[in-house]
């Protein structure tokens, strides 16, 4: 379950959206996170806005992919195994290509983003037309006319490009995740130094919950006792927030924690997906929260 994507915005506070790009081989996890106000680490507002372009691009892509993972996952698996399809769904490669290219045209905020970004765009240039052709092929039932001839031609090519895409995409994620984490941690420090106890606690809750889920890596045994202890610690911090403005977010947090504990007790794909969805709802609540009101 390696984190796939992080997101940083310039408003309200740092928050994340957890999504899963695939439900085929383990528990890939991605996140979309928000950071606040004036771009920590002394970055200008323009730099933050440029970074946000990438955040929105990958956030939209991941949201669609997890929403329709029930179809995307089985389709790529069947093509990988040489099975015939009668319908087809791919991630929104075309939208991602358009949005990432627009983001690149506006600027690249970190030097170490340039190479992985170019790799992703290069694969997208190849996979977008193949995915589009397959989509039309199945939508028009052309497989009935050619007895799956085009599927046999394009299916293996699509699978190969699909794997190349995620190999490149995960590299881009790692860089975005690194910078976003640094910015969020710096912002937490700012909140603490400015005496905004409730806002700092809300930010700490988000960061600790995100770090916990980051640790649920595919193929790595989870220390369930340690995870439950950390969840209790997160709840303790949440309970220290005295502002009623946090109540709705706290309810979403408690639900997410419950789903995480269910997953820890029985680590199935269904429980994992429930955990991801409840985490998304918690972050949705965080993104609607006005952090400035927490310490008034």
Description of each model-found segment:
Residues 2-12:
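Bacterial N-terminal signal peptides that target proteins for export
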Residues 41-148:
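N-terminal Sec/ER secretory leader and immediately downstream segment
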